[in-house]
Curated annotation (Swiss-Prot):
It is an enzyme of class 2 (transferase). Mg(2+) binds at D8, E57. Belongs to the P-Pant transferase superfamily. AcpS family. GO terms for biological process: fatty acid biosynthetic process. The gene is acpS. It is found in: Cytoplasm. It catalyses: apo-[ACP] + CoA = holo-[ACP] + adenosine 3',5'-bisphosphate + H(+). The keyword Lipid metabolism applies. InterPro entries: 4-PPantetheinyl_Trfase_dom, 4-PPantetheinyl_Trfase_dom_sf, ACPS, Ppantetheine-prot_Trfase_dom. This is Holo-[acyl-carrier-protein] synthase. GO terms for cellular component: cytoplasm. SUPFAM superfamilies: 4'-phosphopantetheinyl transferase.
Length: 126
């Protein structure tokens, strides 16, 4: 059964600007080291950062919480399987809330066009 859905859209040019400004503190606050390494290794890294940020926001919306209840940006990590399919890896408070809400699965869709990155997250309950 579907528990919640969340969607978020991000302007990629914001992340292009953050990269140009070399705003490393922002990236360290928003993204895990694995996400930073993944994005930095891509030709269009701003696009990949924007997609990951949108997915984190979409997850928070799907939970109906926002960034509160002790959650941090590092509690939600966007990962890809061997075929490139995106998914979420949860840590800390996000993992605890996921279990407390009896959630069983996340579904993630990422897309981009022009200057925009969009993510949708669906949460399933057992």
């Amino acid at each position: 059964m579907i528990f919640g859905t969340g969607i978020d859209i991000v302007d990629i040019t914001r992340f292009e600007r953050f990269l140009e400004e070399r705003n490393t503190r922002l990236f360290e606050r928003l993204f895990t080291i694995h996400e930073q390494e993944y994005c930095a290794g891509k030709a269009h890294s701003a696009q990949h950062y924007a997609l990951r940020f949108a997915a984190k926001e979409a997850f928070l919306k799907a939970c109906g919480l926002g960034l509160r209840e002790g959650l941090t940006w590092h509690d939600v990590e966007v990962v890809n399987d061997s075929l490139g399919k995106p998914d979420l890896r949860l840590y800390g408070k996000a993992q605890q809330l996921f279990a407390d809400m009896n959630l069983s699965k996340t579904f993630v869709s990422l897309s981009h066009d022009g200057n925009f990155a969009v993510a949708m997250v669906v949460l399933e309950r057992v």
